[in-house]
A protein has these predicted regions:
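C-terminal motif of bacterial Sec signal peptides marking the signal peptidase cleavage site
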Residues: 17-18
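Boundary/entry segment of secreted carbohydrate-active catalytic domains
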Residues: 24-68, 72
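Substrate-binding cleft and catalytic face of glycoside hydrolase catalytic domains
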Residues: 64, 68-82, 91-207, 274-275
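Aromatic-rich peripheral "rim/lid" segments of glycoside hydrolase catalytic domains that contact
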Residues: 27-32, 119, 145, 149, ...
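Acidic-and-aromatic substrate-binding clefts and catalytic sites of carbohydrate-active enzymes
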Residues: 45-56, 77-90, 164-169, 206-215, ...
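Short, acidic/polar
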Residues: 49-64, 137-146, 212-223, 313-319
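Acidic (Asp/Glu)-rich catalytic clusters
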Residues: 33-37, 56-67, 93-105, 147-151, ...
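Structural preference for beta-strand elements that scaffold enzyme active sites
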Residues: 39-43, 67-70, 105-107, 154-158, ...
Length: 374
C-alpha cells in the first residue's frame, strides 16, 4: 500500500508557515550596543547590587543595552586595598565574573587618584608623610597586585585619574607632593609591567576647556616622548545643558586623536538641573556643596525639559559618531536616573537615558536616532 503523504505535507506546511511567521515578525527594539556596533563600544558604570544581579530594574537594561562595563567604586584604593598589607578582592572578583558572563569589555577604575585613597598610603606609623621611595614602593605593589590579578580579563585601566588643575598645571595631590610630577609615568610603567596587553588610560574632567586640555595634551606628549605606554585619553563627559558646545567637543576629540591616542568618553551624563553656583567641573567637593540646592524638578522632569535633554544627547552623539574612527568607547555613568551621583540630599536629577522606573526616555531614542541620520 502506498504511504500517505498527508502528514508529511502538513509537517512541511507547518514548518514553512513557522518560518514565514518568524520572517514577518517585526524586529525587536534597537539597543544602544546594536545601534553603534560598527562605531564604538557603549558602556555603563555599575554598582555592587547590579553586578551581583540584585537590581531587578537595572540588570536587564545592563545586559540588553551595553557591551562594556566600568565599576563605580569597588576597584578604588579604599575599597580594594583598605589597609597596609590587606587586599579585598571579594567584590572585584564578582564584578569581573559579571562582565565575562555577559561578554562585556571590562574596564578597571581607577589605580591612582587623590580621592578615595586611605591616609595610610601616604603616611608612616607616626602619621608623617612617607618618603618618595616608600610611596613608589606602595604604588607599585598596589598596581602589580590589582592589575596582575586580572591580567587578560580586565582589558583597560584608568591608570591615573584627575591629575590636572583647571589651568592645566599639575594638581598638588599627596602623590605629586611626595613623589613629584613623575608619579604619573611610574603609574603607567607599573600598570604595563603588570599586564603588557591592557589598554592604559589617563582620565579627567573638563578637558573641553582649552587651558586644561592644553595641559593634558602636553602631558600626553611628554609621556609618549618618554616611551610611556599610554593608550587612550578618557574624557569624563560630565556635561551641562549648555557646556561644552558641540564645537568644543569636536575640537577636543580631534586634538587628542591627533596625538595618536584613542579617545574614550568614560563617565557620560548630562546635568539638567540648574546649579546654585557657577560650577563647570566634576570636582566631588564642589558638587557636594551644590547638591544641597537647586531642586528645580522635585516632582519630575517636565516634558519640555525631556525634549531638551533629548536634543542635547543627540547633538553630543552626532559629534561622537563623526569621530567614530578615533573613539573606542562611550560609557554612561549610571544605568537609571536614580543611580546617578548627581542626585543630592535636596537635589533630584535626570541625567541619563533611563528613568527611575527603568523606562527609556526621549533621550534614549535621540541617541539611537543620531547614528541613523544621513
Amino acid at each position: 500500500m502506498k504511504p500517505s503523504l498527508t502528514p508529511l505535507v502538513f509537517a512541511v506546511a507547518g514548518f514553512l508557515a513557522g518560518c514565514s511567521t518568524a520572517q514577518n515578525q517585526p524586529p525587536g527594539p534597537l539597543t544602544l550596543k546594536a545601534a553603534y556596533k560598527n562605531d564604538f563600544l557603549i558602556g555603563v558604570a555599575i554598582n555592587q547590587s547590579q553586578f551581583n544581579d540584585q537590581d531587578l530594574r537595572g540588570d536587564p537594561i545592563i545586559k540588553a543595552q551595553f557591551n562594556s562595563t566600568t565599576p563605580e567604586n569597588i576597584l578604588k584604593w579604599e575599597s580594594v586595598h583598605p589597609e597596609l598589607g590587606r587586599f579585598d578582592f571579594t567584590e572585584p572578583d564578582r564584578y569581573v565574573e559579571f562582565g565575562e558572563a555577559n561578554h562585556m569589555f571590562i574596564i578597571g577604575h581607577t589605580l591612582v587618584w587623590h580621592n578615595q585613597t586611605p591616609r595610610w598610603v601616604f603616611e608612616d606609623a607616626d602619621g608623617q608623610p612617607v618618603t618618595r621611595e616608600v610611596l613608589l614602593q606602595r604604588m607599585r605593589e598596589h598596581i602589580l597586585t590589582v592589575v596582575g590579578r586580572y591580567q587578560g580579563r580586565i582589558k583597560g585601566w584608568d591608570v591615573v585619574n584627575e591629575a590636572l588643575n583647571e589651568d592645566g598645571t599639575m594638581r598638588k595631590t599627596p602623590w605629586q607632593r611626595i613623589i613629584g610630577d613623575d608619579y604619573i609615568e611610574k603609574a603607567f610603567q607599573y600598570a604595563h609591567e603588570a599586564d603588557p596587553q591592557a589598554e592604559l588610560h589617563y582620565n579627567d574632567y573638563s578637558l573641553e576647556n582649552a587651558p586644561k586640555r592644553n595641559g593634558a595634551i602636553a602631558l600626553i606628549k611628554k609621556l609618549k616622548a618618554e616611551g610611556i605606554p599610554i593608550t587612550a585619553i578618557g574624557l569624563q563627559g560630565h556635561v551641562k545643558m549648555d557646556w561644552p558646545s558641540p564645537e568644543q567637543e569636536d575640537a577636543t576629540i580631534a586634538a587628542f586623536a591627533a596625538l595618536g591616542v584613542r579617545v574614550m568618553l568614560t563617565e557620560l551624563d548630562v546635568d539638567i538641573v540648574p546649579a546654585t553656583q557657577h560650577n563647570r567641573t566634576a570636582d566631588i567637593a564642589l558638587n557636594a556643596q551644590a547638591a544641597s540646592g537647586a531642586n528645580a524638578y522635585a516632582n519630575g522632569l517636565p516634558d519640555d525639559q525631556q525634549q531638551a535633554l533629548a536634543k542635547r544627547y543627540a547633538e553630543l552623539f552626532r559629534v561622537y559618531h563623526k569621530h567614530r574612527a578615533d573613539i573606542e568607547r562611550v560609557t554612561f555613568w549610571g544605568v537609571t536616573d536614580g543611580d546617578s551621583w548627581l542626585n543630592g540630599r535636596d537635589r533630584i536629577n535626570y541625567p541619563l537615558l533611563f528613568d527611575r522606573n527603568g523606562q527609556p526616555k526621549p533621550a534614549f531614542d535621540a541617541v539611537i536616532n543620531a547614528v541613523q541620520e544621513k
